[in-house]
Design a protein with these regions (language model features):
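Sec-dependent N-terminal signal peptides
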Residues: 4-15
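Sec/Tat signal peptide C-region and signal peptidase I cleavage site
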Residues: 15-21
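Ubiquitin-like/PB1-type beta-grasp interaction modules and other compact soluble beta-rich domains
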Residues: 21-224
Length: 225
């Protein structure tokens, strides 16, 4: 098991005894550069624990909410997204490599023969297929609308004083010391608990053990050397 996952689980164990909401002082992983500090919280509503995770983000006054989300996805290899873009971004799916197995991949329309992966963690859906995507690793965090079950990702903006309001993400810039909460809403389900989000630990890339050989993938050939 990876070191970062062990640290993450240990941290979650200490949090399970607490009921206070996550705060900026809890953040362990800051992404970006700038003079505006914000927090990104994602609550999956998928029954897995911890149910919500938090990142710190530093951006500029003109940085929009969706730009913050995209930056965090591109920087943290454990986090991945599915979006449509038609005059703006629509968030259809968000996922997180919860078990630390580096199996960030999605399938479309049940095609498990050729799962899709993306180096940036950003997957693009279309109006015709956005309900047909599934996460390969069923132990990971993931939620998106499907043909059999509707659902939608909402975004809330919360000030330090605790005021919350739903917000659009494409034009609205981030505000200093605000928390932006993406949570998944599905029919017949309560709003997920995002206040007690767990601050993620920084991603630590394991060193590659070349003594075990190298696996090559080419256009028409693959194998070990």
């Amino acid at each position: 098991m990876r070191k970062y996952l062990l640290l993450f689980l240990a941290f979650f164990g200490s949090w399970s005894m607490s009921v206070r909401a996550v705060s900026f002082s809890d953040i362990n992983y800051w992404i970006g550069e700038g003079n505006v500090e914000a927090m990104l919280v994602i609550a999956w509503n998928d029954g897995k624990t911890p149910g919500a995770l938090a990142w710190g983000y530093k951006g500029e006054e003109e940085t929009t909410i969706v730009e913050m989300l995209n930056d965090v996805v591109k920087t943290d290899p454990r986090l991945f997204s599915l979006m449509r873009r038609q005059g703006g971004y629509t968030v259809d799916g968000l996922g997180f490599d919860l078990n630390g197995e580096n199996t960030v991949a999605l399938v479309v329309g049940g095609d498990t023969t050729y799962p899709k992966s993306n180096a940036t963690g950003q997957f693009t859906a279309t109006p015709n297929n956005f309900k047909k995507w599934e996460c390969v690793d069923k132990e990971d965090h993931w939620n998106s609308p499907s043909v059999s079950e509707d659902g939608v990702w909402h975004c809330l903006a919360r000030s330090e004083s605790g005021n919350e309001a739903e917000t659009e993400i494409n034009k609205m810039p981030i505000q200093n010391r605000y928390t932006y909460i993406f949570y998944y809403d599905k029919p017949g389900s309560d709003t997920p608990d995002y206040a007690n989000a767990v601050a993620v630990e920084p991603y630590i890339q394991d060193a590659v053990d070349y003594s075990q050989g190298i696996f090559f993938v080419n256009e028409d050939w693959y194998g070990w050397d």
